[in-house]
């Protein structure tokens, strides 16, 4: 690890002891140096994990990993299960080609287990961890995640920020803060900014939890419509930049909603 050593000449120490102004200057200087050292240490730790081979990093996982090959695309899921899937509530399906339908998945499981490029954290504005999926991600990633988050200056509703994944199977975590209550524009921004950050960093596989539908009170079906419509628009405009978007679902009610709405937004037969 990089070590920082500061040598202070005797004449500066003498000035420091005599002047309150100089005291303030030195305190501010050392605080700045300390913050710089802290950021350098965080970056060093992040890069250590990012540069590991897959085999080496697997030794650091806190959970059994799920690979992208273990998750069916919506196209494959539909072809396998369409005889058993209800079509009663599907209005005005929006046709897409099979290639686009292969770029989305719905999956019930633990988002912290996904061995992909990035998982999205439904964070709070401090980025310092909380309950639900936020707390689960922080626990699985380890304490280095909180140290990096402390350098980011928080996050506003609808914005997104990126950190390393540390002990997670995912290489990166994209943190976004969902709205409290039903605010469609802000929820849409969460998905748009998260996808934009993924593409900016050449991350081709990404998983979303259901943002804002828990204690933040956004109705599940309304939130799912925004998620699917926003992801569909992004894929249509950037089909060559994203390989898979996974909607990670925890509740059976979420699975039922996505199974219904995927027939509308990603219909291909």
What is the predicted function of each stretch?
Residues 2-269:
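Macrodomain-like recognition of ADP-ribose-binding/processing modules
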